[in-house]
Every structure is written in C-alpha cells, then in structure tokens.
Amino acid sequence: MSDELRKRGTTPIANIRNFSIVAHIDHGKSTLADRLIQMTGGLSDREMAGKEQVLDSMDIERERGITIKAQTVRLNYHAKDGKDYIFNLMDTPGHVDFAYEVSRSLAACEGSLLVVDASQGVEAQTLANVYQALDNNHEIVPVLNKVDLPAAEPDKVKQQIEDVIGIDASDAVMISAKTGLGVPDVLEAIVTRLPPPQGDRDATLKALLVDSWYDVYLGVVVLVRIVDGVMKKNSRIRMMGTNAAYDVERVGFFTPKMQQVDELGPGEIGFITAAIKEVADTRVGDTITDDRKPITEMLPGFKPAIPVVFCGLFPVDADDFETLRTAMGKLRLNDASFSFEMETSAALGFGFRCGFLGLLHLEIIQERLSREFDLNLIATAPSVIYKMKLTDGGEIEIHNPIDMPDVVKIAEIAEPWIEATILTPDDYLGSVLKLCQERRGSQKELTYVGSRAMVRYDLPLNEVVFDFYDRLKSVSKGYASFDYHLTDYKVADLVKMQILVNGEPVDALSMLVHRTRAEGRGRAMVEKMKELIPPHMFQIPIQAAIGGKVIARETVRALRKDVTAKCYGGDITRKRKLLEKQKEGKKKMRQFGKVDIPQEAFIAALKVDG
C-alpha cells in the first residue's frame, strides 16, 4: 500500500473486510486473533513473545480466559491475488452477560468467523451469538479449532454445525490457533468468502458508535465504524442520541498499537477522541453525524443496556466507604452498563445498591473492585426487578426487598422470566431437568443432536441469579452450557422472608422468595447462621419469618459461668439463690445485649442453597 494511502488512512472500499470472531468461552477466539495479528505483522514476534490474548487488555480477561470489552484491530494483508487488503477484526465477548457488547460489534461488521472447538462441539452461547450474526445478515465462515487434539472429531462437529445452526460446514477451515496450523487458510477465506462493506464517500458523515472507554491521557476514546462520508481531524461532530456536539481532536486506528491518521473513510473502523469527559456521554450504538449538516435518521436497532440483576455492595471496613465510591466511579467511566446508588443498612452500614447485566458481570465488577482497588466487600443476595400492582391502583417497580410496601397494600407481584437454552451430554440430562424443575421451570422443548441434548426451559430469573449456573455446572460435571434471554413478567406467589437474630430483623438478609420455597431456604439459612454466630453470654434465637409467622428457628446456646463452683456442700437453697440470680442477669442481658454477627455468617447465609 502506498505511503500516501497509509497517511490518509483511507482505502478502496472493495479492499476492506470487517469481521468478528464468534465463539463460546474458551474455544480459542482470542488465540486465533493473536495468530492473525502475528501473521499479518500487526505485532512483531518479539512483541508477541510471552503474551497471549493480546486483545484482552484487562488482567481479569486473561486470567479467566474470557473477553469482556469488545476490542478492535486493523491488519494489512497481501493476498494471493496480489492485492493489498485491510482487515478490521472485532474481538467480541462470548458470555451471555456481555451480549450487548456483541450486538454492537456485529453491527459494525459484514461477516463472522464462527470458531468451534473440534473436541467440544457447538455450545449454547455459540448459538446465541451466531443467531445475532445472522440477524445482522452476516456471511459466516465456520472454523474448526484445536483439530490437532487427540479428542478432536471434526466430521462430527461439522455435522453438528449443520444440524444445530443450519449453515453449510462442509468447507469449514481446519486450524489449530495455538500452533498456527491452517491459519493462512483463514486469511484467504476472509478475502474470498466475506463481502466488502458498502458506503458512499461523498455523502454526509454517518458513523456508528461501537464502544468507548476512558484513557487517562486522552480522555474518552470512542470506537467508530464509518458508514457514509468521512471522519476528519478538527471537524465538528454531533451525537444524535444525546444531541451533544464535539470537536474531533484525533483520528486513528489500532494495529493493535495506536496509529493516528488524518481521516477515516466509509467502511473503516477506527477511533476518535474529542474532549469528551465521561463515557456515560457516549451511548453505545449511537449515531455520529456532521454537526454542520446533520442527517435526520439514526442507524437502526440499538437500545441502552438495562441492568437486570441488583445487589448491595458494602465495605467490610466502614473506613473504606469513600475509596469504594471513588472506585465505582472509575469503573463506571469504562462500563456504562454498570449503575449504582448509595444505600444504608442497619447491619452492614453504608454501601451501594448496584445494577448489573447478569451474574458474571456482577462477579467481574466485584473482583475488579477487590483486585484493582484492594477493597474487601460483602455482597448481599442478588435480586431482580419486581413489578407490583397496589390495591389503590398504582404500580411500582422494586429491586430491593427492603423497599417492599406493606403486604396489605399489594394486589399482586410479577417477576421476570427468561427462556434458557441448555446444551448437555445426555448422560447428565436427568439431573439437569431435575434442577430446572426444582427452580420452578417449565420445559418448552427437548431435542437431540448426536449424543447431546438441547433443552429449552422457561425459568423465573429470581431462581437463576442466585446460584443456578454453579449448580448446573456441578450436576453436569462442567459439561453443560447455558444461555438465556429475558421474555416477560408473570404474576407469582412471592413473599418477603426476613431473618431475625435475637428478635431483630437483619435487613441485609431480607429476600423475596416463592412461597413454596420459603421454608426450605429459611431453614437452610438459620442452620448456617447457627453454625457461624459465636455463643454469647445469653441464648440467641435465630428465626426466619414471613410477616409475623416464624417458619424456621434455631437457637445459639448461651455460654454459662459456673456460679455454684464456690459452694462446697451446704444448703441447696444457697445454690438455688445463685442460679436464680444468674438467670435474672441473663434475662436482662438478652433484653439489652447486642449480638455481634460475624461477616462470614452473612456471606455463608447468602450462599445457602435452600
């Protein structure tokens, strides 16, 4: 490619290929991205040495082997037909919680490489992401990875791709991303089998905001896909969703190193910076246009990310509250889908009520807070958004059981339901179905693909957020995979269960549960609390109650001083008098004594499977 072209940053649109890699967690997506970068010279072998998953920039992404933020890289490739091509590779997350990151990355591309592990076969999240790619009219090239493993069964997996997804896999590319085997064939398949983007260079600027993140030096960096027109340095742009205008300071792309250019043309993917203060000002999926002659219609199909799961996060040490507030603010800079507001709890002090996209999102935020900011946190039981109709005709939404109005004021409570797709080897099907049944699920369909079963279930989200994923993995020995999407709200017989310690309700342990499961959950929680609350000088009753009705109770026995030790022989009334006096003292203590509940008791009670 000529220096002139490289400087301008624009390329003939027919020589551009925008594609994403779609795969289930751990099927080798980021490793394949590494090989593509290496073989096209994006980074030298020396720079790649000792580095795996170049595009996974967070430590936690590398450690868990998952991709959280969508990443992009631009590669130059000299094809066998003698032409120079530009590849824009979008590395997307594979986990269900980050499905919105996937959807907008896919909207910026025309094709996808579907990477399937030849030893594992198609998994539930592969399905979800492929369907999203097909919804975006993507051309799909199947790639079978890990074909060098002894357990690989490429022919069986090809058949499975055709049966489950319904796309022709006869000419799937066979590779081993780890060793680089077959990767040159992938590069050629991108050129020959994926379509170039469409776009008009002379039209008014129209660009899709794909992602944004905060950089300490540059402020907010915005990842864009140019649809029509040209994005130039020093031009003035407008975000159509927020109606805010900015002056573009830098324009460029990643190779994965940052390269600045003067302009980006139609079909290209790159970044801009424009003195934007907060990531919250850049809505993902928004349309960017020219401020001087704006277009009227936004690009279709994007909605803001809405939190689905909520929980309270409290610092173990109350002095860490300000540090936690600052840390959350910093994480929110890079993650607009994470929301939080302050809350107080009588048991845990000051903390925050946080909203997440799902359980993995919650876990990752929690882990980042403890790892990057060295914070020790307690998380309360995760809950979902409930809709309540009141007797006076009003409607409210709550996600914190503490905010629930008096029972007499509530006409009905509705909870969110999901449709779950579970793929499991048929040996474990029985225990998977039993688990879904226990969680109030209703089966929609059951089909077999080879030796694996695909089950669709309707389940209440409330039953899934708690520990469903862990239980599913344990009943299937880790082989089942799971994907879900929200469907609608259904009215349910839900009750607010409280845990009382020494007659006092512990607000952090309140939860909304289905009436049929309340007793089991309550009993399990009080038994756990009994094990972990140390004995005091007086006995402590631990109760689980619904309204005024106690449904389970355990008692922590009192420590007792032997007050009669000094009485040798003598009259029995002397002993009795001392024992009566002790009894009086205990009674008084129980009335005014404060019970110290250790942090472990909270954490263990919340993890109980009732």
Curated annotation (Swiss-Prot):
Coiled coil: none annotated. The keyword NAD does not apply. GTP binds at residues 26-31, 145-148. Keywords: Cell inner membrane, Cell membrane, GTP-binding, Hydrolase, Membrane, Nucleotide-binding, Protein biosynthesis. It is found in: Cell inner membrane. PROSITE patterns: G_TR_1, G_TR_2. CDD domains: EF4_II (cd03699), EF4_III (cd16260), LepA (cd01890), lepA_C (cd03709). Belongs to the TRAFAC class translation factor GTPase superfamily. Classic translation factor GTPase family. LepA subfamily. Its main location: membrane. One of its GO terms (biological process) is positive regulation of translation. One of its GO terms (cellular component) is plasma membrane. It catalyses: GTP + H2O = GDP + phosphate + H(+). It comes from the Bacteria. Its EC number is 3.6.5.n1. Required for accurate and efficient protein synthesis under certain stress conditions. May act as a fidelity factor of the translation reaction, by catalyzing a one-codon backward translocation of tRNAs on improperly translocated ribosomes. Back-translocation proceeds from a post-translocation (POST) complex to a pre-translocation (PRE) complex, thus giving elongation factor G a second chance to translocate the tRNAs correctly. Binds to ribosomes in a GTP-dependent manner. This is Elongation factor 4. One of its GO terms (molecular function) is translation elongation factor activity. NCBIfam families: lepA (TIGR01393), small_GTP (TIGR00231). HAMAP family: LepA. Pfam families: EFG_C, GTP_EFTU, GTP_EFTU_D2, LepA_C. It is a peripheral membrane protein. Residues 14-198 form the tr-type G domain.
